[in-house]
């Protein structure tokens, strides 16, 4: 994921060294991004190399802290339009794969979690992968 710049809505207790966004992309199965409480939460990936064509993505949540009412949004530098596709993750610990009906092209990709399975609105992600 070195070809993307990542921003997130929040980090638990602002503890970037423990729960920062970079931990979604490392190979360590014990590290994660953990949001602060409150809804909505989001993860934004911005391509460093211009437009990208995305066909699918994978997310591994921590059970009990998964997204609900989720949307994958795509913005292009060539258009003001935002493509928004809902996706429906299960509240489990395993890596979940989501294929798009039609591949989308853009330079900014946003995973929006309108609500969470956690009562306080927290999201915990161990792994996030976008596939071209």
Residue ranges and their predicted role:
Residues 1-49, 60-62:
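Disordered, acidic Ser/Thr/Pro-rich linker "stalks" and the adjacent N-terminal cap
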Residues 52-64, 111:
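A short beta-strand element within beta-rich, extracytoplasmic domains
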Residues 40, 49-56, 106-107:
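Extended extracellular/luminal ectodomain segments enriched in beta-structured repeat modules
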Residues 3, 13, 36-41, 64-132:
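Trp- and acidic/polar-enriched beta-sheet ligand-binding modules for extracellular glycan
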């Amino acid at each position: 994921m070195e070809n993307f710049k990542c921003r997130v809505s929040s980090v638990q207790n602002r503890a970037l060294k423990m729960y920062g966004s970079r931990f979604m992309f490392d190979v360590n199965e014990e590290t994660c991004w953990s949001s602060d409480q409150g809804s909505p939460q989001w993860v934004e990936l911005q391509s460093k190399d211009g437009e990208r064509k995305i066909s699918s993505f994978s997310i591994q949540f921590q059970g009990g802290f998964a997204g609900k009412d989720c949307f994958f949004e795509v913005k292009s530098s060539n258009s003001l339009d935002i493509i928004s596709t809902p996706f429906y993750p299960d509240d489990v610990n395993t890596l979940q794969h989501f294929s798009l009906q039609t591949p989308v092209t853009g330079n900014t990709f946003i995973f929006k979690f309108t609500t969470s399975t956690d009562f306080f609105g927290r999201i915990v992600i161990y792994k996030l992968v976008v596939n071209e």
